[in-house]
Amino acid sequence: MPQRYNKKTRYASKSRKKRRKIWWFKKKAVYLQAKLEIMKESELHFAPMWDLNPLWNTLTEGEKEQLAKDVELVHYAKNEIIHHDGEESEYVWMLLRGKVRIYKEGIGQRQQIIRLLKPYDIFGYRACTVNEPYNSSASAFEACTVYRLEREKFNKLIQGNGALCYQVMLMMAKDLAFSEIQTVNLTQKHIRGRLAESLLLLLKNYGYEEDGKTLAMLLPREDLANMSNMTTSNAIRTLSQFAQEGLLALDGKHIRILDEKALEKISRLG
């Protein structure tokens, strides 16, 4: 039988389309506003790379002059992708301000956060050094500014400066050691030990706010779970247990550390 014309259904369909359109424009407006804010910051002056990370102190004056010409200042909005896992390596980055997450996607597109970077950290260099695709993804955890250097120019510096090459080897060795420790932490420790380890890692990277108790990092529970190799519900439940035991206090995304030594003990015992 032919379908009868239904005016209510037609109006409902139009209403849904209108709501979707409004939602899309709002989302676009938020994104553009974020881009506008970080574009305004492009006028800010950032010190040369060699004044921010000791890796570059090994450069000669001539190499520093060339690096200043070659490096680019780039801004990323919150959650904007910097590079994808499997993408051809093109740049080495150094974070200037903001925070960046390095992660891999597993089954069901579940993210495993490998590292959270702080200002002046260098990333993307391993893939560029061996001319391989990136083996992880990087995205802006919050609006951030970076220096980036093309792969060929980075490799040319390494090949022409033995001291710089040695410093890159040291940096790679430290990152490898960190990865080995994290592998043990995430596979052998129990849930409490893994979460305590993640909280201590955030504390080491970002420190406290002015009150000397609150972590200077607003991390959603999902991201904290992805750092700790557990489900979001387990992360929420374990945080609540820590709060009940007086180890920390929760206020939305704010986490106040009340007993750092107890967290260290839980992390150590696993």
Model-identified regions with their sequence ranges:
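Polybasic "coupling" helices that flank or enter modular domains
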Residues: 141, 159-229
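Short, positively charged and aromatic/hydrophobic N-terminal segments
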Residues: 5, 21, 26, 30-31, ...
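Cyclic nucleotide-binding regulatory module and flanking cytosolic helices
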Residues: 39-78, 122-123, 127-129
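Cyclic nucleotide-binding regulatory domains
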Residues: 55, 80-143
